[in-house]
Amino acid sequence: YEQIPKLVENAFLATEDSRFYEHSGVDFKGTARAVLVSLKGDYGSQGGSTITQQVIKNYFLSMDKTPKRKAQEIYLAYKLEQQYSKHEILEMYLNKINLGNRSYGIATAAQNYYGKELKDLTLPEVAMLAGLPKAPNNYDPTKKENVQKEKLQKPKKLRIPSKKYFTYDVFSQIARNIDG
């Protein structure tokens, strides 16, 4: 955990689980939001799984989308939080997360996409990597068509997911670098 820069930690918490340090493995508020969005027919746009649940899914369970698997995920996430610290869980997550382009884990992604160590990533690079878990292949910055598509959609998509982890100045810097 000590090798993960605070910027990387904050970026992933802001995009993936802004209440990570406040829940016990399952964020029922986030899950309820995801269910409501799904009921409206907007499938895939809202993730209800916490970082802890994603660790359980990535390390221990199949990717099946069944009620039984979801129940197992919730139960095991609660148990994982009893056995490991939040820092250990975050480290597990960042070491296994699929970031596309055959990049499993944040350190591998930093090397594959930017040829850099984690500690050497710039703010815009960290922001790009933190956005990949939602749809790694759709946002892969090495694919020319994704870069072009991203430039066309940028005005609609740029939003602040969590003011808790970044200041307005940080998001302004990200926006300037993305547009440039």
Task: Indicate residue ranges for each PLM-predicted region.
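Non-catalytic, structured segments within soluble enzyme domains
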Residues: 43, 47-180
